[in-house]
């Protein structure tokens, strides 16, 4: 009985003691709003999920953008190939015409030599030396007659040798002309074939882009929505973290750990490395500003009036011909700017105006800074497939037809034209335009390439793990962290310093 009473008293005492604990929990819940049914949107798990969502959308955009860039640069390559084939055909035609003139000259030489030989033979026959011996009055006449005969024989042999040489030259030139004709015919066929390939590549790119346009827009919208949601949650998180500081001291709650945000920097661009400094390895840490020098950079205008656009509406052949026409004009602009740049440095211009990197090392840094200054002046200019030439942004082709801007290789073409370096409008060709440097040793002013054989993308390394690029359709010229994914093992250096 005593044991039962004691047990009952214990249970009652426990329930009474539990009342303050329950009341305290309810009070804390009321003060801090932490009901079990309300999930904290700024919780670490939610933030991590949203960050992963943004990263996933970025990755998808990067992959699709890479596929589109590859297709676009394939068209740029095809157009460059057309230009090379047409140049080869024109050179072969000039060689053929020179060969034909050579054959005509050889025929004329044979005809002249034959006439001289015929005249000599007739004179010898009519006035042969046989009667001279009979009419000679003294031995001296005989000696003179003999000498004259020997001279005539030597002259005859000389005329005959010239005739034979002329005939041999004729045969050689006719053979060379035949080879030139075959070469010209093959070059013409190659030019036609390369044009067909370019047309096919352009049509394929048009079809591919049209098919991918919807997906590109969907992914861009998905990425924008995910980023907006992440920004909103981060804002809520920042507001929520400030609330506990205002709570009454009488009812302190354990301080919540700050929500882990993997990257507090601005939202990454598609495919960007979260830590460009770590990714940079041994890349230079040169400051992004121009090197200290006595040059007055303000007097070097990095732009020129825009030259006519490459875009022509209509069939692909018209587009290709227009692009090649603008390339010719762009080359002349490059030559003019090359002369101007060298004159600014106090160096006599090259005969053609094209420096093609042949700039004295003592002026190399100034040249690199001028190239970069030209590029940085275009930040914010839209991406335009096929856009960009030596004078600045231009309307592109197909999807870039309505946009004045640059594509990746067009931006590099524009930047280096300022110092007289002529580049093709194709990243793969630009990759082979200078000295290859291991990417771990790249420095300010080197070109960075992406994709197999540099066929996908090109950018300019600025130093400190940053690069200048015209990345993809829908974007614009901007500075981005260097991406190592897909990078070629070498960068290209056009200017030494």
Swiss-Prot record:
Active site residues per record: 408 (nucleophile), 457 (proton acceptor), 469
GN (gene name): ripA
Region (Disordered): 177-198, 253-297
NlpC/P60 domain segment(s): 365-497
One of the Pfam families matching this protein, by short name: NLPC_P60
Disruption phenotype: Essential, it cannot be disrupted. Depletion experiments show cells grow as long, branched chains that form clumps. Periodic septa and DNA segregation appear to occur normally along the filaments. Has increased susceptibility to carbenicillin, a cell wall-targeted antibiotic. Depletion effects are reversible.
NCBIfam families per UniProt: NlpC_p60_RipA
Species for this entry: Mycolicibacterium smegmatis (strain ATCC 700084 / mc(2)155) (Mycobacterium smegmatis)
Bias type Pro residues, positions: 255-273
InterPro entries: NLP_P60_dom, Papain-like_cys_pep_sf, PG_Endopeptidase_C40, RipA
Subunit structure: Monomer.
Gene Ontology molecular function terms on file: cysteine-type peptidase activity
Name of this protein: Peptidoglycan endopeptidase RipA
Top-level class of the enzyme under EC nomenclature: hydrolase
First and last residue of the signal peptide: 1-39
Family note: Belongs to the peptidase C40 family.
Cysteine-cysteine disulfides: none
Keywords: Cell wall biogenesis/degradation, Hydrolase, Protease, Secreted, Signal, Thiol protease
């Amino acid at each position: 009985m005593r044991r039962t009473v004691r047990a009952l008293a214990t249970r009652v005492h426990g329930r009474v003691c539990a009342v303050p604990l329950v009341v305290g929990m309810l009070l804390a819940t009321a003060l801090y709003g932490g009901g079990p049914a309300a999930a904290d949107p700024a919780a670490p798990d939610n933030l991590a999920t949203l960050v992963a969502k943004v990263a996933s959308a970025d990755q998808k955009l990067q992959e699709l953008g890479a596929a589109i860039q590859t297709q676009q640069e394939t068209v740029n390559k095809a157009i460059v190939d057309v230009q090379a084939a047409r140049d080869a055909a024109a050179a072969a035609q000039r060689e053929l015409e020179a060969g034909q003139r050579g054959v005509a000259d050889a025929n004329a030489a044979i005809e002249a030599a034959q006439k001289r030989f015929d005249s000599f033979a007739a004179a010898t026959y009519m006035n042969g030396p046989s009667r001279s011996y009979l009419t000679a009055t003294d031995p001296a006449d005989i000696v003179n007659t003999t000498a004259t005969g020997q001279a005539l024989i030597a002259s005859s042999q000389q005329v005959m040798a010239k005739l034979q040489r002329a005939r041999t030259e004729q045969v050689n030139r006719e053979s060379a002309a035949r080879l030139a004709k075959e070469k010209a015919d093959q070059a013409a066929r190659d030019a036609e074939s390369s044009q067909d390939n370019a047309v096919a590549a352009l049509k394929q790119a048009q079809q591919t882009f049209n098919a991918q346009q919807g997906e590109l827009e969907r992914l861009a919208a998905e990425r924008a929505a995910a980023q907006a949601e992440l920004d909103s949650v981060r804002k809520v998180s920042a507001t929520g973290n400030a609330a506990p500081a205002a709570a009454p001291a009488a009812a302190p709650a354990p301080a919540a750990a700050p929500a882990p945000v993997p990257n507090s920097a601005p939202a990454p661009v598609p495919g960007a490395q979260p830590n460009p400094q770590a990714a940079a390895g041994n890349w230079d840490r040169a400051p992004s500003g121009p090197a200290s020098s006595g040059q007055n950079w303000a007097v070097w205008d990095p732009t020129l009036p825009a030259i006519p656009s490459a875009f022509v509406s209509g069939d692909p052949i018209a587009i290709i011909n227009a692009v090649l026409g603008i390339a010719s004009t762009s080359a002349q602009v490059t030559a003019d700017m090359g002369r101007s740049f060298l004159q600014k440095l106090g160096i006599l211009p090259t005969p053609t105006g094209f420096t093609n990197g042949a700039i004295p090392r003592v002026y190399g840094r100034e040249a690199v800074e001028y190239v970069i200054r030209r590029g940085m002046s275009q930040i914010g200019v839209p991406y335009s497939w096929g856009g960009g030439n030596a004078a600045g942004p231009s309307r592109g082709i197909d999807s870039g037809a309505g946009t004045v801007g640059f594509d990746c290789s067009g931006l590099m073409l524009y930047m280096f034209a300022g110092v007289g370096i002529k580049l093709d409008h194709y990243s793969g060709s630009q990759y082979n335009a200078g000295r290859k440097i291991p990417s771990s040793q790249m420095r300010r002013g080197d070109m960075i390439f992406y994709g197999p054989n540099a066929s996908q993308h090109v950018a300019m390394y600025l130093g400190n793990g940053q690069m200048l690029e015209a990345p993809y359709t829908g974007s614009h010229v901007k500075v981005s962290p260097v991406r190592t994914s897909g990078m070629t093992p070498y960068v290209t250096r056009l200017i030494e310093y």
